[in-house]
Amino acid sequence: MAATKRKRRGDLEVQAKKPKKNRKDAGQPAKQADVAKEAEEEKDRIPGPVCKGKWKNKERILIFSSRGINFRTRHLMQDLRMLMPHSKADTKMDRKDKLFVINEVCEMKNCNKCIYFEAKKKQDLYMWLSNSPHGPSAKFLVQNIHTLAELKMTGNCLKGSRPLLSFDPAFDDLPHYALLKEFLIQIFSTPRYHPKSQPFVDHVFTFTILDNRIWFRNFQIIEEDAALVEIGPRFVLNLIKIFQGSFGGPTLYENPHYQSPNMHRRVVRSITAAKYREKQQVKDVQKSRKKEPKTILPHDPTADVFVTPAEEKPIEVQWVKPEPKVDLKARKRRIYKRHRKLQQKMSRGGAK
């Protein structure tokens, strides 16, 4: 009975197309205005996305870090996970563990690529890009980090959408940059038909080479005029080494322009110390000059060329001794003493 009922009801698509009839309007023909209105709505209606194909590219990226990272690194990791729907997260790794353990973590998480952030001295951040478990891998020093929350740019993109990857033409000039280009393509490009991705392309990742560093930017593509508006985040990758294996092995390339953060801080300290020593030397020279006796220069006759001689006044010689000046205070004291003596005499005479 159930099968016969289903046959009578028909397919769900046919049922959806049939208009519902009310008891009140039973037997009345549909109005032409309503039919025209429905036709216009169907024209304006945006069709849904095309049926997804088969998900063939099974790239999965493990993004995690070591212990001791600061808040900016943590926010950068969250931004990358949000921009890369094919990524996976894991707990922080202990500093005591060796880097080869990450290959086992990738195998357990079913990931074939890894982005690992390694923090040192609570101020230096290193990024490892690795193809697990056979390699190759690259180590970078991360500089100039600016997260999404920090930048507050006007650009925006759909969460889970697929990005375009734009590379500097300089990536094709040198072999180690060509290797890094292929590496970045495999890591940052979202696989087609990924379950967590959206069938839209509305932003672009740009990788630019400047000052022997790789600069990362993320821009929104505006549909109206195809202009670019920056979204974020921003960071700069300074290449250190490229290894043949995953997190180790023979060195394929070493950057000759790389300067470690410790060396950079040492140079800055030496420059400030040199400035301080220079100031102290200037002060010592000034003190020594003050203590030296002044050298008396001989009279230069050419200095008196434009000097006009002053009128000579006659010198008067005083032959008579000048009268002594009257000291008024001493005179008052004498008068006071006389007056006091007279009073004493008078008081004695009256007593007799």
From Swiss-Prot:
One of its GO terms (cellular component) is nucleolus. GO terms for biological process: ribosomal large subunit assembly; rRNA processing. InterPro entries: Brix, BRX1. Residues 1-47, 281-301 are annotated as: Disordered. Keywords: Acetylation, Isopeptide bond, Nucleus, Phosphoprotein, Ribosome biogenesis, Ubl conjugation. Gene3D superfamilies: Probable brix-domain ribosomal biogenesis protein (3.40.50.10480). Residues 59-248 form the Brix domain. SUPFAM superfamilies: Class II aaRS ABD-related. This is Ribosome biogenesis protein BRX1 homolog.
